[in-house]
């Protein structure tokens, strides 16, 4: 009797640790996976191409060009200049323009996803990871998840990272433009 019970228990333990084979993947968050796939189908082809964003205000000038490829890679260039308002002899003047170290060309990867990378509410993200092409710049050009609004034939609407419009969004325009400064 004891032998039968032990044999039965061992058989149950062996069955519990044996895997059932399935060709279907198991997702930790099926909803996020399905919405990510839908997001990529709907907007992935629209994002592929070259986009630019230009912002010129009194104390800073910013230009960025991003070229997204359908293999999930992208290249970019950024030009960023600032100047300070100083008082000389009681009068305010701007200093000359200084190019920030964050300027330069970079290469990396991109992806669209639906998730909550920082906790909280899930939403659509454009994930960007890129290193500067200049090896002397020892930091990333991008390593972030930007909230993704939409893309169409003319506009890529994403949360601004370095620079943005007053509403917090950056509206990149399609096309291969050059910096005006």
Label each residue range with its predicted role.
Residues 16-19:
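C-terminal motif of bacterial Sec signal peptides marking the signal peptidase cleavage site
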Residues 21-109, 115-181:
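Lipid interaction determinants
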Residues 4-5, 67:
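Residue-level detector of intrinsically disordered/flexible regions characterized by low predicted structural confidence
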Residues 6-12:
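Sec-dependent N-terminal signal peptides
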Residues 1-4, 110:
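Positively charged n-region of N-terminal signal peptides that target proteins for export
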């Amino acid at each position: 009797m004891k032998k039968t019970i032990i044999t039965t228990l061992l058989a149950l333990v062996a069955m519990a640790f044996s895997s059932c084979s399935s060709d279907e993947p198991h997702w930790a968050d099926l909803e996020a996976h399905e919405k990510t796939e839908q997001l990529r189908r709907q907007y992935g082809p629209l994002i592929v191409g070259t986009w630019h964003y230009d912002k010129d205000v009194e104390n800073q000038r910013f230009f960025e060009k991003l070229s997204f490829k359908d293999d999930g890679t992208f290249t970019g260039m950024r030009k960023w200049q600032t100047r300070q308002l100083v008082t000389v002899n009681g009068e305010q003047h701007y200093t000359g323009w200084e190019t920030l170290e964050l300027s330069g060309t970079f290469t990396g990867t991109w992806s669209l996803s639906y998730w909550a990378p920082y906790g909280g509410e899930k939403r659509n993200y454009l994930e960007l990871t890129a290193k500067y092409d200049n090896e002397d710049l020892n930091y990333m050009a991008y390593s972030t998840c930007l909230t993704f609004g939409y893309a169409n034939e003319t506009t890529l609407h994403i949360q601004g990272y370095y620079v943005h419009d007053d509403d917090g969004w950056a509206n990149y325009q399609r096309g291969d433009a050059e910096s005006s400064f």
